[in-house]
Amino acid sequence: MHYYVLTRLELSTVPSRPSVSPPPGKDSLIVPGSSQALTIPPNIEKHFQNLEFRFHAGYWKVFTAKSVLGDKDASIFVFDKAKSNIKAPPRIGRMNKFALADLIKYETNQLSSLNHPKILYSMHGLEESKDIMAFASEIVHFSLPMLIHDEGIERLEVKLGVLQLIDGLSYLHNSAKILHGNLTPDAVYVTVSRQWKIAGFSFSVAAKEPNCYPCFPWTKKLPPSLQPDLDFLAPEYLQPNQVTVTSAADVFSLGVLICWIYSGGKRLIDAKNNLETYQIIVGQLTEALNCISEQLGPNLRDSLCKVLSADIDQRPSVQLMALIKHFDDPALSAMRQLDDIAQVFDPSQKAHFLSHTLHAALPSIPENLWFTRILPRFNEQLSDSVELYTSLSKPLFFMLEHCESHNIHKLQDWMRRILDNIQQKTLRAFVLENLSVLFRRLTDEKVEDKCMELIVHSIKSDDTSTQSSAIRGLSHIADFLPLAFITRKLFPSILSLPPYLHDNVPRQLDLLAALAALSDRCDPNSLQQLLTGVSLCSSHHPVIIHAKSRIVQRIVTRDPVRLRDSQLVCVHLLNPLVIGLANRDLRLVFEKIQINKLRKNMIFLELLIIPHPFFFSHAIFQKRMGELQWPIFRKGF
């Protein structure tokens, strides 16, 4: 049976559509490299504006656009009938010819009837003028050949894209009951958010019976452009008297496409539209797979041997392909779950995924995917989900801490968003404990101001856990805080802590650790404020005495000239050290070491009381320093 007769039968199954032939539109599209301006159909012009050429994809010229209603991003696919409408040879006794335009009508009609996340979404059906055919879809950024050849792609993203194709084919076979029939690189588009979408339904057919689809053989009598791509066609299409195929035909095409992707755009079968060459190559596919085994890896290669088998029964179903060992990867699983997070309606499941699963997988995900896939998903799906900000903060702060410096600015909006919604107790605690990441990595005055405001409010809070989080975080950010903020806002807020500190040794230790870090930033005036804060830790517990001793040591070894006020030295430093020497609860193991340190500190503080500059040349000072082998001018203590 001749191919063109079967094609007519196929087209007869397409629902009838009214002929659309409006007058030419007013606007013209200029395609780079072409001197001809394309006039878009009026109905496309009516609904879409700001068209700009993006790329060529097969016989389509693809433009970006904005919808008039809603200002949504879109892509306009334009076909130039005047130049590209290839026609079949005339039929005997008939003047009409089967042409590429007929396939396009069928393709867009099929596309409009399908609705699935992995199928290209049609926003506006086909419109036709005298010379132009056009339709609108969701925005696409690349064709698959552009992505593979020009942009480059991580292996993890390749796996993710292939799984998306598997999902799309599974929908076609099991739900829509459609065989794609021509799954080639030109049939796959990549959206701005890096989702791979299936299109190119010119040769798709509906099932006659369960898993039984009409088969139209490839023939030399028709131009290749009016037939499926021979290099991606299953061998059963070419069997003599073959009238039906199964979904295994699409599985074979998918296998060839996977080889094309993993080999960097090299065709596994390159028959150049020659049937004899095709048959020879198909008989040697095992050897062909061996040539690209390094790119495929052992697990995928072994699976593809079955996928590309000439024996239909050896090929797995498309959904089973997703279960092969090659795709058993925690990072890949996390990326897939993130892509589908909009379909999860339980907030607790989303929170667990973001704070645990995704956070744990981030070290295994290449950094460029953090910003090309993960962050865009956050922006699209989660920017308004304030209740999930605590869970989102974990992966976001991990990305901020570990990303390259040129990517830091991409996280700025999220950090501002988090600090603007800091009311949640758990979120506030997490941010307080990770303030050092913000100060160290992000140069943003607005964020820094918000952080300092958060610190003061948290210290003054009535919630003890919030106060603890704020105080514990101070020791990590002391070097980043402006001295004016420390003296005017931070120290006064610390003086409000006696109820929080009362008879609580761990809390007093946390405060002393914070004050020790802040002491390096203090001048003589602010040092008095700091030592007043030290006095708030009034416990006589040995660890408190030891912590105070370390603060004294830190101050006098860093810059003793700051200690000019003798009353300050006696009240805030000598007094607690004397108490420490008299403390009988000090463990015997540490007693000698502790007392020796306290002795040294006290002697030095006594000498500081002698008016400056006399004490530096005073004989007693020099003698006592020698006796104690004071290490102030040596490294260490």
Can you describe what each PLM-predicted range is?
Residues 56-104:
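ATP-binding glycine-rich loop module of kinase domains
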Residues 109-117:
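Structural motif at the C-terminus of the N-lobe alphaC helix and the adjacent alphaC-beta4 loop
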Residues 121-131:
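Short beta-strand micro-motifs within the conserved protein kinase catalytic domain, predominantly
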Residues 130-143:
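Conserved short submotifs of the Hanks-type protein kinase catalytic core
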Residues 161-162:
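Activation segment signature within eukaryotic-like protein kinase domains
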Residues 173-191:
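Catalytic-loop of the protein kinase fold
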Residues 185-231:
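Activation segment/activation loop of eukaryotic-type protein kinase catalytic domains
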Residues 236-248:
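Conserved end of the kinase activation segment
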